[in-house]
Amino acid sequence: LNDKISEIVDSELKNNNKAKKLIELLERISKMKFLDPACGSGNFLIIAYKELRRVEMRIYEELENLGEAQLYLEYVKLDQFYGIEIDNFASDVAMLSMWIADHQMNVELAEKLKSAARPTIPLKKIGGIYNANALRINWQEVCPRTEDEEVFIFGNPPYLGARLLNKEQNQEMEDIFKGVTQYKRLDYIGAWFYLGAKYIEHTNSKLSFVSTNSICQGEQVALMWKPILELVEISFAYTSFKWQNSAKA
């Protein structure tokens, strides 16, 4: 999005047309939705919300620089953000953390844009942080979307090898991978990729997960990626790197 802003600002368009394009970008951003189906205490959602708020601020700053200052309106809102978390305490923390992030960004807004004000109280509605099992709940019910809407799914699903799954987790894998041969050899995280692929199929939505490299090498490649690539295509990927996190698994 920052690249898109720079592209507009650096273009040969007249300032009023640049302003029009920037406002159109704000309107597009306001319709986006963001879902973390393994959100834990909300780290990824918090970062996404804060960065989107900063994009919004930058656009208003650019409008002012162009001599096309606009009355401040709220485009990025908490109700665009959704999460699923199986741990009750963590889901409560995620909800609270989003409200804290909202307050922090309201303070930052007041410092950057002197003419803008955005009250924290009363607390704003969050799209939904669901205390539920992401492999047992319909993601479409959590974060409803149409084919044209832009929904961005991201997160850090749990890492468990196929041999470490308990009885309940094995049953979840069986229910999700019906018709997929040798699913019992797949890591637990494969279920999030498969459900995510089904969610974004034939839509403008995107999905990106931090994942174990085991699903991208050895026997799991053919087992997992074949059914997924029948639904969607890969637009980008990163090579393996060391990842530190405080997740339980």
Each predicted region: which residue ranges?
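Signature of N6-adenine DNA methyltransferases within the class I
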Residues: 46, 53, 91, 99, ...
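Conserved SAM-binding motif I beta-strand of class I
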Residues: 81-84
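Conserved SAM-binding loop
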Residues: 94
